[in-house]
Swiss-Prot record:
Transmembrane segments: none annotated. One of its GO terms (biological process) is protein folding. It comes from Mycoplasma pneumoniae (strain ATCC 29342 / M129 / Subtype 1). It comes from the Bacteria. InterPro entries: MPN555-like (IPR054820), Trigger_fac_C_sf (IPR037041), Trigger_fact/SurA_dom_sf (IPR027304). This is Uncharacterized protein MG377 homolog.
Length: 193
């Protein structure tokens, strides 16, 4: 997670972790699902369709719960978004992720990315979440055992090793965020036109 951000976040009131968050719809972006499907298949070539379906369903639900939690959490903060940082994130999105989208859409996504990083930095300190070298090594070893693919590059290259740590930290923070709240599913709303 980004720790050297120019943007800032200030907690303006204590986060109410006993808040019940309403989930009124489940959003599943086909491109998001396909991206995860390909990632799973690249790691586990012999994955059965039922296991793949189960894992993708789990990912979609987790992503939706996390989004609902983050929507609630950002209301407890006041943000000061650095214009140069925002522009840099927007350019990266336009180049690597979103082609042809309107600037206001890209800006909204870029602001969410920056706010998420700021909130994660705050919550990581509050919850004292860390990923040790030993945990990173264990995950890399487990990956080797399951896939039989070479992992030496991740153990020998500090940048790749830290990339694994960052991915694990982000996943842990997503799960911690979800686990700090209660959710109520109210999926009886209207279908979008």
């Amino acid at each position: 997670m980004a720790t050297n951000l120019k943007s800032t976040a200030k907690l303006v009131k204590p986060i109410q972790y006993d808040e019940v968050i309403e989930v009124e719809r489940i959003f599943a972006d086909p491109a998001f699902i396909e991206q995860h499907r390909q990632r799973i298949l690249a790691s586990f070539k012999d994955a059965k369709e039922s296991a793949l379906y189960h894992e993708l369903t789990h990912i979609v639900i987790k992503d939706n719960l996390f989004s609902c939690a983050m929507n609630a959490i950002v209301g407890y903060f006041e943000f000061n978004i650095d214009e140069a940082e925002l522009k840099n994130v927007m350019e990266g999105l336009k180049r690597d992720v979103i082609q042809g989208a309107e600037d206001n859409t890209v800006q909204a996504i870029a602001e969410k990315i920056i706010k998420k990083a700021l909130v994660f930095n705050h919550l990581q300190k509050e919850w004292k979440v860390e990923i040790t070298d030993e945990v990173v090594k264990n995950v890399i070893s487990l990956y080797y055992e399951k896939t039989n693919q070479s992992v030496r590059e991740y153990l020998d290259d500090k940048q790749k090793f830290e990339g694994v740590r960052t991915a694990l930290l982000e996943e842990r923070m997503v799960l911690e965020t979800i686990n700090h709240f209660k959710f109520h599913f109210n999926l009886t709303g209207q279908l979008p036109n």
